[in-house]
Amino acid sequence: MKKIIEIKTDKLFTDITEKVSEYSKTWGKSGLVNIYSKHTTFCIWCSENEILHKADVRFFLDKVAPRYKNPEGEHNNIKYLHDLISLRNDVPSNERINGHSHIRSLFFNSSETIPIDKGMLILGEWKKIFGIELDPPDRDREIVCTFIEE
């Protein structure tokens, strides 16, 4: 079975655990679910949904791959070669200035695989499934959930 989760991101962390669990219960079998992001700057991550832990992750990302601003306060990522649009070939007209987002994606996965027992996700007590938005929010994103029977 394959299901698509469509979301419009409004923050860095979007908890998708309940939606994946709902699909898993509907499926009702044992096996695995692969949760896959179709996007290069939107990742899938399993971790604890604790506010200070998420603040630590945000702080780490801002240190490792900051999003630069010019003196007028506008975002200007000229620190990243990816953002030198004039030097790149085949760049779409709506290309984002998001070199920092691509560097941040190095720390996450594009997918996670979770075991299922009779329709129930097998997650640890505190473990949640997140979509991680590495670009500025307000993006339409698709997550593919593929259920594989035992």
Stretches with model-predicted labels:
Residues M1-E150:
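Active-site histidine-anchored catalytic micro-motif
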